């Protein structure tokens, strides 16, 4: 890891986001444990690499509305454990909301940030991932997102 960081530094390249996209809401205990453990390792690696943020989504598959409800408490548990580790290591982490995942919309995203209440938790904002209905008033839609969570991007 140290050599990777050094090679980037020699080329004056700053690693902005270390992507570690894991299945954090999966109800399968073994899958979720592996996801949390892997993300924790990336948080630790980041102490060496020095990226601004270690980022993830909260699932892999496209989930139905019912599946998102089932996966939600598992996601919350995983995120809480990761935020605790990020705080312990003094490293920032970020979540990326995706319409098809348990972290699916503004309401759920606000809930996560309020419950976690950590300066170490940030947000990756890819508008295409949260736009369910493109025919809506996008100006109002994005304004709502940015007013609620713009300081977390």
Q: What does each of the following model-derived ranges do?
A:
Residues 2, 7-14, 24-125, 132:
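Active-site acidic/histidine proton-transfer and metal-coordination neighborhood
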Residues 18:
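Zn-dependent metallopeptidase/amidohydrolase metal-coordination segment
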Residues 21:
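Active-site-adjacent segment of FAD-dependent monooxygenases/related oxidoreductases
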Residues 135-153:
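Glycoside hydrolase catalytic-domain groove-lining segments
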């Amino acid at each position: 890891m140290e050599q990777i960081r050094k090679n980037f530094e020699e080329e004056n390249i700053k690693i902005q986001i270390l992507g570690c996209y894991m299945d954090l809401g999966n109800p399968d205990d073994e899958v979720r444990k592996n996801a949390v453990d892997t993300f924790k390792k990336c948080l630790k690696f980041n102490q060496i690499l020095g990226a601004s943020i270690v980022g993830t989504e909260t699932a892999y598959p496209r989930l139905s509305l019912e599946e998102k409800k089932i996966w939600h408490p598992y996601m919350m548990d995983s995120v809480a454990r990761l935020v605790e580790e990020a705080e312990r290591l003094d490293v920032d982490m970020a979540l990326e909301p995706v319409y098809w995942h348990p972290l699916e919309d503004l309401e759920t995203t606000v809930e996560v940030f309020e419950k976690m209440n950590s300066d170490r938790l940030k947000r990756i904002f890819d508008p295409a991932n949260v736009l369910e209905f493109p025919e809506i008033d996008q100006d109002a839609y994005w304004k709502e997102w940015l007013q609620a969570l713009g300081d977390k991007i």
